[in-house]
Amino acid sequence: LFLFLFAIQTVITVSAQKVQTPDQVYGQLFKDVQLSRIFPDNKTFVDCTPKRKPAAIVADYLKIKNNPAIRFSLKLFVEENFTMPPAPPAFNYIQKEKDVAAHINNLWSVLKREKDKAVEGSSLLPLPHPYIVPGGRFREIYYWDSYFTMLGLKESGETATIKHMLDNFKFLIEKYGHIPNGN
């Protein structure tokens, strides 16, 4: 049994798609953006999508960043070459329920995200089924949080949503060889 499981894991790992991370794609540009703190957190730039081919953006960056004839602004360069991630949906859910269970049941629709669309150059790993995010400011699923989310969904009778989330995990394993912390 152990050898069989090992063989299956080996096949999954070998056939898994390799995806370059933003630091691999953007190299020095990524490092400079993250260290300059032009964004309030380290996640914003990771979630930006390029307006053109990443290799062209990096080549332009390396060419002009230290050019003394150009008054270079890293923030302006990023704004011109990347689309900022959309703001999370407004969390306008304020109702007085009679009990905590009713409140939680009503939050599922606020925290639910529909299946993702692939965007070239985005770090988002698109998921084929709807899922629940761990809170209002989040745009993606998180592996560890999903366990506790599914426990809550089970208590609420949301079995279809649990199935979608498990199908997303299956998809991630088949495509990437593992379930990353976030998609």
Each language-model region and where it sits:
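Compositionally biased non-globular segments, especially hydrophobic aliphatic-rich helices
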Residues: 10-16
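Acidic, mature catalytic/reactive cores of soluble proteins
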Residues: 16-183
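Bacterial N-terminal signal peptides
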Residues: 2-10
